[in-house]
Amino acid sequence: MAIKDWPVGEGPREKLLNQGVKQLSDAELLAVLLRVGLKGLSAVELARTMINEFGGLRGLLAASQTQVCRLDGIGPVKFAQMQAAVELGTRISQENLQRGKILSDPDLTRDYLMRQLSDRAYEVFAILLLDSQHRVIQFVELFRGTINSASVYPREVVSLVLEKKAAAVIVCHNHPSGIAEPSTADRRITERLKQALQTIDVSLLDHMVVGDREIVSFAERGWID
């Protein structure tokens, strides 16, 4: 049944307006963007098919135009609409961070890092540079590839911190496997960075490891004194 034939108030758009956006499932949210489905397939059913095809919403939104447009009923316009929605969310998170809310709202930091790093097919090691009031100066991706204790160079981190005149930092990296649990190598890297930053009187506030759906905080686990 097409969405236009659903009882009044039951379509995803009406549900959003009447009950709020948080009441919609992933498929219903995507259906609002798609607007229409295919013959014999509603927009919600099409959205559900797309999500399943890529193993989840994250996989779908990280897929290339070529991959997405192979699906029946999906062309460049629908792909562009999805990408625009993702980018708007990313820019809002970045704008909020730039307003200095990072430490007063830990969830904002997690959301920003999740948007930045969770969909990468390779490891990225990055740093949030903060001023003396813990406002964000800049987010910088420093290293890419296989991140281990040998591939992250404390001297490069220190050089960047001095260049930007940062007073404190939060480092972060992703696990493409989707599992956020820190490794022994992650803990070694953190200790080396903490010691290097102490030599220039800069605080390492946290090391966050980003997975598919969660972020592990070293500070919350008591691993950063």
Curated annotation (Swiss-Prot):
The keyword Isomerase does not apply. The keyword Cell inner membrane does not apply. CDD domains: MPN_DUF2466. Zn(2+) binds at residues 173, 175, 186. InterPro entries: MPN, RadC_JAB, RuvA_2-like, UPF0758, UPF0758_CS, UPF0758_N. GO terms for biological process: proteolysis. Keywords: Hydrolase, Metal-binding, Metalloprotease, Protease, Zinc. It holds the Pfam family RadC. This is UPF0758 protein Shal_0429. It comes from Shewanella halifaxensis (strain HAW-EB4).
